[in-house]
Amino acid sequence: MFIHIVGPGDSLFSIGRRYGASVDQIRGVNGLDETNIVPGQALLIPLYVYTVQPRDTLTAIAAKAFVPLERLRAANPGISPNALQAGAKITIPSISNYIAGTLSFYVLRNPDLDRELINDYAPYSSSISIFEYHIAPNGDIANQLNDAAAIETTWQRRVTPLATITNLTSGGFSTEIVHQVLNNPTARTNLVNNIYDLVSTRGYGGVTIDFEQVSAADRDLFTGFLRQLRDRLQAGGYVLTIAVPAKTSDNIPWLRGYDYGGIGAVVNYMFIMAYDWHHAGSEPGPVAPITEIRRTIEFTIAQVPSRKIIIGVPLYGYDWIIPYQPGTVASAISNQNAIERAMRYQAPIQYSAEYQSPFFRYSDQQGRTHEVWFEDVRSMSRKMQIVREYRLQAIGAWQLTLGFTPGPWLLRKFFTIRKV
């Protein structure tokens, strides 16, 4: 498989004819309902034989296919790199030999839709973390979920279901609830026991702790709670995963509640939420810039074994009205819908080489200018390359109902997915 960047005058028909792929193939893999593609749009071409184009080089072809140049040369010993002929056929070597896991979050809808989505994603999934149970100040689990169908389907499809436990309230993630639980030994033990009972009685394979906005004052207590929970779950053969905000140093005041080294020594896996560097309340910019993801990984692997680390990627972006006015809020948009929006408004897509992130601008019916940052097959491919480069455990995503049609194809290209 390789990626074609749409140029001026390109159509799906002309691109398909160029490479020997049908329009339906290209539309299906990329999830396109319409055909009015725009310059700069990245299209995944689902072929393992590349047809050389005028002025192509082997280096350029390797970059399009996201494969090492040496591997491309080795797969095509009869090809002279200095005398490529237009129309020649180049074999794209498989690089799926890296065994990796995946962990994605899923917000329940209803049993029928739960079964359908899980069945769709199961071939490309190791674990699915079902969202979400939330906690009370006394350590109780404060809600119930209709999760039986989702749990049953995941196991049937050789995927491990994890229960996501959060500190969510109607007002968002609550620092205070976590503080109350952690500072009360009775409540803390009660929560550990309640999580164990939930996992064991509902039939989960483990748990993902997603406590956000933990205060610096509770840093050591939080790590101690995770150790206590690990010991309880381990006795039953259950997995403990934690979702943590991305950190590039220990000197970020609002992230001091997370002791990466201490947490990494306790949990089975650490899901790093490597997104929202720019968010709904910020100025426009890349949501998951590769520069910051790389800095996060390098900070993390100095303290946490690389095979415990899962890099979480966003299946969404944001649509800002510009010029940006402080206090305004951007609209969240799925990556798939962002591409559809660029096509609807015929907005050329640009790509930041520094951040490895796509973006575009368009004018709406009211004449307002918008700027949209999102993820496409190029930026996702770079993130998957980084998993391989740093020998990480897995890649993950928030969250599956947002969808990203080329995603499973990319997973199959870069990895052999570990199954139960």
Curated annotation (Swiss-Prot):
Subcellular localization, per the record?
A: Spore wall
Domain named GH18: residues = 100-420
Q: Which UniProt keywords apply?
A: Carbohydrate metabolism, Glycosidase, Hydrolase, Polysaccharide degradation, Repeat, Sporulation
Which species is this UniProt entry from? Answer: Bacillus subtilis (strain 168)
Family listed = Belongs to the glycosyl hydrolase 18 family. Chitinase class II subfamily.
Instruction: Share any extra remarks.
Output: Transcription of ydhD is dependent on SigE.
- Descriptive protein name: Putative sporulation-specific glycosylase YdhD
UniProt cross-references to Pfam families, sorted A to Z: Glyco_hydro_18 (PF00704), LysM (PF01476)
Provide the GO biological process annotations.
oligosaccharide catabolic process; polysaccharide catabolic process; sporulation resulting in formation of a cellular spore
Q: Which PANTHER family match?
A: DI-N-ACETYLCHITOBIASE
